[in-house]
Structures are given as structure tokens and as C-alpha cells.
Amino acid sequence: MKKKFSIVIISVLLLGYLAPFDTLLVGADETTVTEDTTVKTAETETATEATESESGSDNEKAEEPKEAEASKETTEKEEKAKTKEPASNIKTEINTDKSQLKQTNLKAVVPAGSTYNSLFPDDNLAKKLAVIITGNAAATGNESVDSAALLAISQLDLSGETGNDPTDISNIEGLQYLENLTSLNLSENNISDLAPIKDLVNLVSLNLSSNRTLVNLSGVEGLVNLQELNVSANKALEDISQVAALPVLKEISAQGCNIKTLELDNPAGAILPELETFYLQENDLTDLTSLAKLPKLKNLYIKGNASLKSLATLKGATKLQLIDASNCTDLETLGDISGLSELEMIQLSGCSKLKEITSLKDLPNLVNITADSCAIEDLGTLNNLPKLQTLILSDNKDLTNINAITDMPQLKTLALDGCGITSIGTLDNLPKLEKLDLKENQLTSISEINDLPRLSYLDVSVNYLTTIGELKKLPLLEWLNVSSNRLSDVSTLTNFPSLNYINVSNNVIRTVGKMTELPSLKEFYAQNNNVSDISMIHDMPNLRKVDASNNLITNIGTFDNLPKLQNLDVHSNRITNTSVIHDLPSLETFYAQNNLITNIGTMDNLPELTYVDLSFNRIPSLAPIGDLPKLEILKVTDNYSYLRSLGTMDGVSKLRNLELQNNYLNYTGTEGNLSALSDLTNLTELNLRDNGYISDISGLSTLSRLIYLNLDSNKIKDISALSNLTTLQELTLENNQIEDISALSDLDNLNKLALSKNKIIDISPAANMVNRGASVTASNQTYTLPTVLSYQSSFTIDNPVVWYDGTPLAPSSIAHSGTYKDGEITWTNMTAASSSTEFNFNRLKDGLTFSGTITQPYKSAVKVTANAEQTYTIGDTISEEQFLKDVNAKSSDGAPVTSDFATVVDLNTFGEYEVTLTSEKDGIQGDSCKVIVKVLHGAPVISADQTINYDKHATITEKQFLEDVHASTDLNTAITTNFSTAVNLNKGGDYTVALNSENEDGVKAETVYVTVTVDKDPAPIISAKTDITYDKFSKKTEAAFLDDIDADTNDGSIITSNFATAVNLDKAGDYTVTLNSINSDGVASTPTAIIVHVEKEKIATISANTAQQYEKYAEINETQFLKDVHASINASPTTAVLESDFETVVKLDVPGTYTVTITATNEDGGVSAPKEVSVIVKKLPAPEITADKEITYPKFDEVSEAEFLSDIHATINEKNVTITSNFSADVNLNKAGDYTVTLNATNEDGVKATPVEVIVHVQQGERPVITADATISYDKFANITEAKFLEDIHATSSDGQSSTVITSNFETATNFKTAMSYTVTLNAVNEDGISAEPVAVTVTINKEPAATLKADAEVSYAKNEAVTESDFFKDVHLEGAEAPSTAKATSNFDSVVDRSKTGDYTVTINATNEDGAVSTPIEVIVHIGAESAPVITANAEVKYNKHEQTDERRFLYDSDAKIDEANVEIKTDFAEKVDINKVGTYTVTLTATNEDGQAANPVEVSVIVSDAAAEKVNVKYVDENGAEISAAETLTGNLDDAFSIDAKSIAGYKCDATLSGVFSTVEQTVVFHYKAIEPGVVTIKYEDANGKAVAEDKQITGEVGDDFEAEAQTVSGYSCRAIASGKITEEPQTITFTYTTATPSKKSGEITVQYVDESGKKLADSKKVTGDIDDSYSVEAKAIDGYSVVGDDSAKGVFTEKSQTVTFKYKKNTQVSKDEPKVKGKTNQPPSADTKLKVDNNTLPATGDTENMALAVLIGFNMLLVASIFLFRKPKTNQ
């Protein structure tokens, strides 16, 4: 009873004790959550994986079939599973159920009176818990706390910010009081000691990720209920062996640590018996043996373990279902993993050394293999993979053979893109394959892709295919990509009922085929091919998108029945007509830019169309655009001279953006005021720049919603229409003719206004814009003042330029040294002959740029110039005109010059005269000019003989000479000569003497020249011997030679010869020497030839020793040998050379005796007697070995035989002989003892050295002892290796063994990025396995000192140059804040420096590092200077067709002319240089000057004007019903050339029209309309000379154009022999035969005319012609269709009693023009109506077949008169 009572009492007290905690209660079962922080590491890993996933799928098309998408989703789920973080999203949970709060048997009891700060030493931990438990965000940690409050918490999130944040936790002391914790998140902190949580046995989930100081997991061993553990991203964590015994742990995440060796041992039982998932990504594992001991391991993630070379050690992990070994870059082989029978997925992506996957076989449950981006060359067999569904082998560049991919009955996805496959192979037995990716390989054929009944996705893009074959056995194909191959024909793409995506782009396709039976097709891509016809695109009810851009398309077909087509792109083709673009109810976008379109049709019934681009075409007008109710964007730019009309634009009322730049709108003036745009009230953007001809913009006044308007480069003067456009924000009006901008003053929303290149001189209307901060650019204005000033030397004008505040803007510069003062500009001392002067203005302030040039025209005074003086002779006749010409008189502007020459100068009187020259223009008298005219006496005339002869050595004076040549002048003036200096009487020859004279005025006579001849001496005669003989090598000079041959002359003249050059005394032979002599007068003797004989050289004798010895291997050449045997020749000089066969006979490496023969031969063929020498080569002596007697080595020493020989100082006295020993075979350095080693040697001659023995002693080893400094410090960021650390602490081992190496954990135990103290442990083990005692060393990382900043003292930038703060730091070469320093440099550059204003600015640079150290600031001066000269770029040449419409603006566009400065205009001489109507190459120069007056370097562009072939003109001939009556013809010509054609004659029809036109880019047809002709009647009359009928008239009828022939009939009592012929015309004709009274008959003769071909075959009926004997006849060949006459086409002769035959021979024509009418006989002009033809009966009549039609016209009315005359004259003749 007492016991029960006690329990009740205790219960009451316990409830009373817990009462204060009622404030924590939220509800019966509710959870109070104060933080919801997810684990940052989990986010990072997920983001990383997501990034990799996105990167990997960027190249995949969005249009993949659903099956492919499902596969992709599966892969993504798997990726998410791989990166799962077990302790993510832990929320703080406080348990409010008092019955569950355990306060008995507590392991740690909270001391009474505790506060959070006292219980938890870490201030951050204390404060966080205080906030969590009290619910007060302002808690400080000084609040009271007891066990109950802590025991109420079951889930706690204490994750930090970065692990390096001031609020992060570094000490978790106190957490031991939270004994009811089941979930704890301590990620992103600075925790290194886990001891406080070692007894929290209720923990199920623990997150310790991203604690950079955590080096081990000591403390987790007792967490027996732990199921999830996250220790990822702990870079110092190497060992996780403490988890090995956790009995229920199911999941470990240890990715991104520093684990190299995975040691998992549990002596007490099974190792991690329940572990299913192990995350070990991004470590440095090399061995996976421990993982094979985990009995339930299913999922293993070892991605990014770069040192892992094989998976073979996993063989025992038989429960594994998933292995992710991606990015294990050292993985070379999988090893034997055949035991992993439950494996379902293996991922090997990015294993860049993995060359084979041959072990992936016999895995019955394997579903997914992903091995992309490896180095796989060999697939092995891939046998027995019955469940494999996904095989990813992409980007294995060396994989060429895929024959192993067969017999996989469940395979659905096969990715082989980016490999090196050249042949597909068989792909047998893949019945369920749905997706096949083969892009980016080297395939030339895909004919093997067949019998894949479920294939829905096929990508073979980026290969070398030339054909795609039939593909008939792919009935379910939905997605096909064959782009980027070499296909020319894809016509087999028909009858694919499921195909919804086709991509054939980037090939060379010309033929697409009919593309029938593709009912499911949604998207078709054929861009970048050679397709010319896409008319097959019709009747495709599901087609949504077509891209056929960048082809050669001319025919786009009808586009019928495309109800769902949304996007159509045919840009960059050769399309001329798009009139079929209508009735497409779903079309939204239409791209047709860069074509040749001239006809766009009506473009109606396109209710969904929102975007149209027709730029770069030849569209003449936009009038055809119909009702497009949703069109928002219309671009018709760059149609240039073709687009001249807008039409009404009444069907596009919803248009928001209209771009019409670079056209010729209003070229003809028909567009008026742009009223066609006035109803487009929804427009917000309008671009009409570069139309060039727009002047009236009043039609834009209603566009009240406009925000952007560009009217650049037109002819606009008046902009008042813009005053109501109050929504305008940006307006561009550059390059127009605007003077007044007051209309813009109230546009309050305008924030950017461009007015450059106009005629504005008053900018004050822009004041409101400038004051509110808008940008106004009005540079490069050009204005010419209207008043032309006249002046004498100076003039003044008022300054007309007004600044925005209304005040005059002072000039920035004034030409011709003008000055500015008080608002006036004055020019003085104007002397230049110019028509104008100018001044510039330029100011930039408050966002306004205003600059330009004002030109002031003026008339300047005339200035006259002339020569200072002019000379004439008395009696000259000179007019004033001639005088002005003689003195080169000119005026500065070409005005006439006058003078007083005629009145001032007397040309008959000697003296000097001053003449005044003047000029006048526009009433302004010019400056006068004075010329001195001198009138002088006439020059004397000299006469003398032209030649004279003197004897040599004669004595002649100048006076005597003048007398001898009869020299005199007409004025008796003195004559002077150069006789005494020019003539040498002591030397024969011809000399020229000059005679001069001058009158008293100094006027000189014309010089006369006399030739003086001094007679010469006769030629000398040489005498000498005819030949002479010398010994070879004798020495003779030319003088000795002449002496030897007794050479002499008869007059003592010197003899010369070519002895020195002609004779070679060192070479035997006969030489010819020529002797010459010249006397003192230069007269040469006859040359004399002398023969010089040089005798042959004597034979020499050889002497030498008879024998010579050499050591073996002696280095002796032939020269040395001859020297050694003292070989010599007794003759000197001699050409004989000693030679021997020493080098071919003697072998110095082979001992023996050799006989050497010495010979000598001179150049003249003399051979000396040979000399023999015996040469003995001696053998090598036996070698001798020397060495130390013994040597000692420590145990375990590593000594090679070579080192041993070196150590014992083993030497041998003979090189190339090797000492050998039994050291390596007999001496064991791992075993102490004495060993005998024998040294031997044998030379190459087989002689052995005496053996030498050496004793080798091997010592025993010692235990190492480590010594080192106890402490050391380093600067933060120092780059210290472990080797350097060991050196710095003087670490050594006492045993002195080189194999004993000291190791440490220096690299893992220290972090040079964080200043603090670290403990490093040193270890060493000798080769006997004895370990040294570990030694601890304290390493202190010092705090980072403040960075020392250095930079240039100043830097300069151009005005307006774009410079960031980063650029500024780089430009001043800032140093001190670069890595590894954490100091971050800052400056006030952006706030201090105004780059739009020139001047100097002081910028201050500061820096603070992460340890809080502040650098000393430094200052830099920034100079902002004027802009540099602009730079022009342009194409090297531009081509135009002759007559093409272009101008300077178009030229600049076509040449892609650009300049690197805004608001700087490029100027050209295009208009002056280029004649577009004349073929040729012209050079155009581009120039530019910026507002600072700096000129760009000129750029030259070649403009090539060529003839352009135009489209043909068809000529048709039709009757009144439109039926063709003659073959059509074709006219061709060059573009813009005119053509004119007359209607041709067509039998039976009439047309008198002439049609003309101009050849153009469009094929044209002209039609001649003919009227049928009713034929007229030909009446034949028979009359006598008086006009009386002698027989009844006859009539001939027929079709117009038919030939007719009429012959005079026989009439009794009358005579007439005539035949008339012609053609029937539409007018009646009359032919009259005139008869004479019959006379007594005369004998007649007969001519038979025959017409045959070249073989004699008859071509036409023969014709007989008769006439009186002795009368002459003339017959002509008949015109026969298809034949031409061979030879003469006429014959003449005389009728005789004997019958005659004339035969015309024809040959067949090779071709008859279809365009020429066929002619029977010669073309005849029919006689006009009622013309009477009278034929003389005494004249041989024409045959009719060959008469010209002009005959009737010629004889016409005159024939009667001619006939009458003949009638009257003929009888007299007969009498």
C-alpha cells in the first residue's frame, strides 16, 4: 500500500514539475517547426547531377517519341536515387506527450539552474537551441533550461550556413542531454568531435555532411539504432571504419570525402548486416574488397573515384542490383563480375581509360548498361543478357565494330552516337528495339537497318551517307534524323504512316521526292541543301512546321490542304513568287527573306499569322497584302530599288512592329505623305530609315502609340507631323534635311533623340528633353547661310547657332583664321581665291551632343598674276593678246585680264616700258599687276666656212683661223672662238670650233660651228719571230716574251700583246699570241700572230720506306700513312699526286700483314713507277684487372653489379673490354654473411685476364628512430608539400637506411586555407618491418596578413571608352589581391570617373581579406582624353549589274561599310567615281572624321559594274482568236537593255505593230495580234500599143502570199512574148501584156532550163525559153525550198539554131530556221493595184520564177513609155 501511495505522490510531483512546460504545447499531436533548412550538400549534389543530366541531353531533340521520353524519365529517376541524401529536410520536432518523456535512468542530467549558455559551451549552439525551444526568435541563450525541455525534442535541424560562417557550430558539447533525439542534422558546420552524441542511442538518422574539420567518426560506434548516416563533403575524412559494427544501418552517404582505403571490420559479428545503399562518390578509392563483405548491399555509388582501376573485387557482393562507377577515370577494366547475378544497372559514363566491357555477359537480370564517353574498343560478346533494355555506348571514339549487339530480345534503346562506327553490321534479333541513335559516326550506308518492327526513333545524322535506302520494314517509325550527311536524294521517304518528324537538313539534296502517304508528319526540316522544288508539300493534314531555308528553291508548289501548318521558313532561296501563301488557317510565322520574290499574291485567309519577314527580295509593292487580322510584326527591309509602293495597308490594323528600312519608298513621289500608314494606330515600332526619297511624313501624325520611330537617311525637311506622337520614347531622324525641330519640344516621353547630319543650327526646342535627362544627339550638322557676301579683305556675320538654353553657341573652330567676339564672327585679310569659308561648333553637356559646320559663301576679289618682265626685239609685231600669253597672265577665278600694252609699248624704239594688267568680276576691281617690257636691238648673224684642214704640228693663231674660214657678221661685230682650247695641232683628228658674237645690247648671235681637221701619221709596221718554245712551269713576263721573239716597229710605237692572258705556262700545249701597236695619232697596226709552244711535264720518281707497323685500332688515314712512310716525289714543281690503296687494303681492326702500293700520275698523263710498302697490324695484349680485396654492405641494401664494380674500384687497362662477375648470382644482400665474388675479362682477340677475387660482407639492419622539430608555422596559402614539410622540421631516421622512409598525415591533417594549429603524426618502418615510435609535430597556419596593393600611378582612356572596374584593375596592373590571397579589391572607379567628360580623376583602391586584415589604400590618376581616330572597315569589292539602281547609301550597305564610332558619318566619292551605266572597275574611297577632328585612314573599295543577263522575252504571233499562227521566238539581252521588234510578215495575215520594252529580271511575253487578209484578184489584160484589147481578159485567184505566173497568149496578127509573176496580195492587181503588130517570122532558138541536185536528180520541172536567133538571153536559177544553188545562180548567152540546155545544180540545206517564212522563188514585191505592165516583144521576157517582186513597182507607170520607145526603135534596127 505504501508503495502504491509513493507512486501516486511521485506522479503528482512529476506532473507539477512539468507544468511550466505547458507553454510548449501547440496541440495534442502537433509539431512546432522553427526552421526548415535542407541539407546543403544534398542540394549541391542534386544540382550537380541535374547539370550533368541537362548537359548530356542538350543535343537531344525535343521531338523524341514518347517511348524515348519515358526512358529518359526513368534515367532521371535513377539519377535522383543515386544522389539521395538520407538526412535531408529534418525538421525540429518537440515531443509534447509527457507520458513519453523519460527522466529516469538518464545518462546525463541537466544541472539545476542551467541556462543554454552554461549548458552548451558553443554560443551558436546555445542560441539556436534557445530559439527553437522557447519559440522566441530574439532568445539570447541566457534563458533557463532543464532536462524535460531537452528530452522533448526528437528531431533537430542544426545545419549551418557554409561551414565557415560566424553562426556555424564548432562544439556540440551538451547535445548528450537530448537523449530522445531520433533525427539530428549537423551539416554545414565546423564540428570535429562527436563524443557528445556517442550515447544518443535513439538516433535513427544523422547528418554530419560538410563539416570540414571532421577527421574521423569516433563516437558513432554506439548508435545501435542508426539507419541513415550522411558524412558527405567532409574533405578531411579519410576513415569511416567506426561504422562497421552498426547493426541496423541501411544507408551511408560518404561522397566527396577523402577516403582512399575502405577498412570495414567487425570482429564481434557481421559487417553492416543491413546496409543496402552506399554512396561513395568522389573519393579516392583503389580497392573495393570490403564492400564484398556486405551481405545485403544492393546499390553502390562509386562515381568519380579517379584512382579505381577495376571492379573485380566486387565479385562477392552477390546482392548488388545497381553500380554507378561513372567518371572513374583510371578504370581500365571491369574485371570478373560474373558473380553479380542480381545486377540490374551498371553505369560507366566518363571512364576515359575503359577500353573493353567484355565481362558484361551472363548477367541474367541486367536491364541497363550505360558506358558513354569511355575509350571502349571491344564489346566482347555481350552474351546472355536476356533482360537488357537499355544500352548506352555514346562517345566511344574508338568503337568501330558493333557485331556483338545481337540476340537481345528485350533491348528497347540503343545509343551509339559519337563513336567511330563505319558499318552497322547485322543487328539481328532485336525485335523490341524502339530507339536507335547512330549520329556522329562514319557510316556510309544504313541498308542494314531493316527488320526492326518496333523502331520508332532513328538518328543517323552527322555521318557520310549518300543514300538512305528504302527503310520499308520500319512500319512504326515516328522520328527520323538524317541531317548532316552527303545525301543527294531522299525520294524514298514515302508511305510511313506513323512518321511525325523528318530532318534531312545539311546535305546536298536535290531531289526530295513526292513525300506521299505521310499522314502523321508534323515537322519537316530540309534547310541547307540544294533543293529547287518543294511542290510536294501538300495534303499533309498534321504538318505544323516546315524549314526549307538556304536551298535553291524556285518552285514552292501550292501548299494545298495544310490546315495545321504553323511555321513556314523558306528564307535564303531563289523564290520569285509566293502568291500561294493563302488559305493556311493555322499559319503563325512566315520567313521568306533573302529570295528573289517579285510577286507575293494576296496573302489572305491567314487568320493566325502574326509574323512575316519578306526582307531582301524584289517586291515592288505591299498592295497585295490582304486582310491579316492578327499580324503583329511585318519586316520588308532591304528590297532596295524594287520596293517603291506601300499600297493601302488597310488589312493589317493589329500591326505593332513594321520594318521598311533600305527601300525606295516614294521614289516616284506616288506615296505622297505616307497616308497608307495613317490607320496603323497600334504601331509601337516603325522603321523607315534609308529609303532616301521620303520627304512628307504627315501621314504618321495619327500613330499615337508609337514608341520607337526611325526615319534616318531620307529627304525630310518638315517634322511638324510628329508633334502629336506623345508616346514616343526613341526617335531617330539622322541624315535628313531638317532645320526646325520645334515640333518635338512637347514630347515629354521622348528619352532618346538622334538628329545628326541635318541642317539644325537652333537646338533650343530640345531644352525640355535635356532638362529631364534625355539623350539628344545632334552632331555633324551642315548648314549653308543663304546670303552670299562680297568683300575686299574682310567681313563680319552674327553667330546663328543657338544652344539649348537660347544663348549663342560659340564656335569651336573658325576657318581662314576667323575670330569670334560678342556674338560676331569676323574674317580679315582674306586672300585665298575661295567661294566660301566655314566655322564649326561642338558642345557636349547634360546628355546633349550638338556639333556641325556652318558654311558662309562669299565672292572674293580678283587677283592678277604674270611674269615680272618680257623681252622683245626692235621691229617685232606683238598684239596685246600675244603679250598676255607671253607673260602668262592669269586671274584667280578665270576672269578676263586686260592691259595698257598697246598704248605704252613702242616696239620700234629701243628701251624699257612698264605695262599694267587688271581684271574685274561682279563689279569688284581686282588687284593690278606690273610687267616690265624691254625692246632690244637685233642679234648679229655669223657666216664662215664649215670645214678647214691643217697639217700636223702647224702653227695657227685664232686670228689666222678666222681669216682662213672667212668668218664675218652682218653687223661687223667682233667674233670670238674657242680655237686655242678646242684644237690640238700636235695630234691628228677632227675638232669642232664654236664661233660667237653679240651686239651692243648684249644680244647674242646664233653660234656657228666649224670642223677643223688635223692630218694623222701613218700606221706602224710590226716585225718578230713567228713562234717560240718554253718549258712547262717556266716563268716569263710579257716583256721577256717580246724580247725573246725580237719584236719591233718601224716607227718606234709601243708593242702590246695578250701573252699574259693567252698563254698558260703551267699547262702543255700550243697558244696563239697577238701583237698590236698604235701610234700617237691612234692609228693601229695590222695585228701579228705568234705561236707559243709549251712542252709536256717530265715524269717524277717516287721514294718511300719499305715497311710500317701499326697498333690494332690505330686511327690512320691515307694521308697519315704516306707521311709515316716518308713518301715523296723528286720533281718540283709537278702536277703528279701521290696516291695509294691503303684505305681499301689495310684493315686496322684485323691483325696481319698487308701490301700497299703507292702511285703517282701527272696531268699530262705521265705515270711514275709504283712503290710497294708492307704494313703490319699488331694484336691486342691481354687485359689486366685491378680491384679492392673486400667490401661491406648493410643488410637490405640495393646494389647492382655495376654499383658493386664501382664500389670496389674495379678497373681494366683496356677499353671496350667488360669486367664480369658472379655478384648478382651469388650475393644475397637480404642475408648477412661473407660472399666471394670472382672478376673476369676477355678481350676481343680471345686473350683472358687473370681472375681477381673480392670478399663481400653483408651487415645486419637497425631499428629506426625518428627525430624532428616539435613545432613549425607556415603562412596561410603557402604551397607546402609533405616532402618540404619533412625537410623543414628536419625529420630524419637513425638507422641511416635509404629504404626507411618517414611518412606523415601532413596533407590530410592540415588546411592551408584556414589559420589554426594542426597535429601531424610522423611514422617510419625499416625493411625488417620494425616501426619507429610515432612523433607528433604541431603545425600552425598563421593568419593572412593584409595584402600590399601596387598599381600604376596613372592610366589613360579615350572619351566614352567602355571600361569596367575589372578592366581598370587590369589596365593599372593591380597587384596584391590575386590568388592565393583572399583580399578582394574595391574602388570608387564607377562613382568617381565620368568617362563622357575629358579630365583627370583620382580613384582610390582598397582591399580586405577574409581574416579581416585591411590593406593600405592606394590612389591612381585616371586621365580621360579625346577619342581616337575612327576606324573604317568595308568589303574589298562590291559588284553591281549595269543599270542597277543604286546610290551612295546603297553602296555603303552593300560594301558592309562600318565605323567603330557612333555618330561618325562615312563619306565616299561614289557618285563622282562610279558610272553604273558603264561596265568597268571603279575605285571608291571611304573617309570619315569624328567630332574631335580626327580622320580615319581612308579605305578603298573596288566597284565592279558588269553586264547582267536578263530573263528572256518570248515573242508570240496570234490571230484574232488568240491562236498561234507562227512559231514563237525568243529575245535575249542584258538587264535593263532596251529591245524593239517589228511584226514579221506572215502569209495571209497583216500586222504593222512594233513592240518595245526593257529586259528585266522577270521573264516577259509580248504578243503580236494579226488580222487575216482577204485575197485580191489578179486581172490579166491583152492590149495593143494603143490600149485596145486584142483578147479577152483573164483573172487569177488564190490565197494571199501565193505565187502566180501569167504568160502572154498567142493572138493572131500580134506578137508578144512575155511572162509576168508575183504574189497574190489583199489588194486587186492588174497585169497588161502589150502586143505589137506581127512581123515576118524569124528563125527562133530554144533554151531548156533544168533544175537538178548534186546527183542529177530532177528537183523541178524544166522550163523552155525561146527567142530569135542571135538575140541574147539571160536566165536565173529558181528558188527551191530546202536547197541552195551550187555555183552561179544565173546564165547568159545567145540563141542559136541548135537547141541549148542550161542546168542549175542544187545542194540540200542542212537546217532551215523555224522563225523564217518559206519562200518560193525570190521574194517579190507585188505590183500595186491597177499598175499596167507593158512587155517589149523584142526583149527576152523574164521566166517569172526568179523575178523580184520589186519589178512591178520599178516598171509600173513607166513601162508603157519604155515599151513604146523600143517599139519605135526596133523596126529601124531590123531594117
Curated annotation (Swiss-Prot):
A Gene Ontology cellular component where this protein is annotated is: extracellular region
**Keywords from the UniProt entry:** Cell wall, Leucine-rich repeat, Peptidoglycan-anchor, Repeat, Secreted, Signal
Q: Which NCBIfam families match?
A: LapB_rpt_80, LPXTG_anchor
Topology in the lipid bilayer is annotated as:
Peptidoglycan-anchor
Q: Which InterPro entries match?
A: Cu-Rt/internalin_Ig-like, Ig-like_fold, Ig_E-set, Inl_IR, InlI_Ig-like, Leu-rich_rpt, Leu-rich_rpt_4, Leu-rich_rpt_typical-subtyp
Q: Where are the LRR repeats?
A: 152-176, 180-201, 202-224, 225-247, 248-269, 274-295, 296-318, 319-341, 342-364, 365-386, 387-409, 410-431, 432-453, 454-475, 476-497, 498-519, 520-541, 542-563, 564-585, 586-607, 608-629, 630-650, 654-675, 682-704, 705-726, 727-748, 749-770
Q: What is the lineage of its organism?
A: Bacteria, Bacillati, Bacillota, Bacilli, Bacillales
The gene designation is inlI
Q: Identify the residue span(s) of motif LPXTG sorting signal.
A: 1740-1744
- Please indicate if the UniProt record lists rRNA-binding as a keyword: no
Task: Give the main location.
Answer: secreted
As given in the record, the signal peptide range reads 1-28
| Similarity comment text for this entry | Belongs to the internalin family.
What is the protein name stated in its UniProt record?
Answer: Internalin I
| Record field: compositional bias (Basic and acidic residues) | 58-85
Instruction: Extract the ranges annotated as region (Disordered).
Output: 36-97, 1713-1737
